[in-house]
């Protein structure tokens, strides 16, 4: 197990071996796991509720289908357990976890999640809407973290975090 100090809290992280497996298996097993993002020394935690697998050798929807390497897709070829973050429609960031062996372009997209605590919900609501969780409208509450771009905005994830190791202390 990888033990990490995240925001002053000792946590057991998933190992590289967890990510170095079949992408569909990893996608299923990520459901219910917690993602911790440290911002200004404070950990924000969400439970992963929806994932989607992309396998470059098989899936035409994968950015690196057919082993296509570009500046954008280079992170998909990184070691398993690497964060792959990219921008879609010029405005929404998407977080993926690289899976399978290095050089094999495959990843799991995090599609949705839910805050673990009221404090996490407040911090994420502030990032998304500029208000506390209690002040969110019913519509905002219903659609809080139900999309990859919404999840990234709530966790303040951008392309600046692309390539981060999931074994480290920031994610």
Feature annotation, model-predicted:
Residues 3-171:
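Conserved, well-structured core segments that form or line functional sites
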């Amino acid at each position: 197990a990888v033990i990490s100090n995240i925001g002053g809290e000792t946590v057991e992280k998933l190992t590289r071996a967890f990510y170095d497996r079949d992408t569909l298996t990893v996608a299923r097993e990520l459901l219910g796991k917690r993602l911790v993002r440290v911002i200004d020394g404070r950990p924000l935690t969400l439970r992963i509720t929806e994932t989607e697998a992309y396998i470059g050798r098989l899936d035409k929807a994968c950015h690196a289908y057919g082993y296509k390497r570009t500046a954008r897709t280079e992170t998909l070829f990184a070691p398993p357990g690497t964060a792959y973050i990219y921008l879609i429609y010029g405005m929404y960031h998407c977080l993926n976890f690289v899976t399978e062996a290095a050089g094999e372009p495959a990843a799991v997209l995090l599609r949705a999640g839910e805050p673990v605590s009221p404090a996490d919900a407040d911090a994420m609501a502030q990032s998304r809407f500029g208000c506390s969780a209690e002040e969110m409208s019913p519509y905002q509450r219903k659609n809080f973290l139900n999309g990859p771009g919404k999840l990234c905005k709530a966790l303040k994830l951008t392309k600046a975090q692309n390539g981060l190791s999931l074994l480290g202390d920031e994610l």
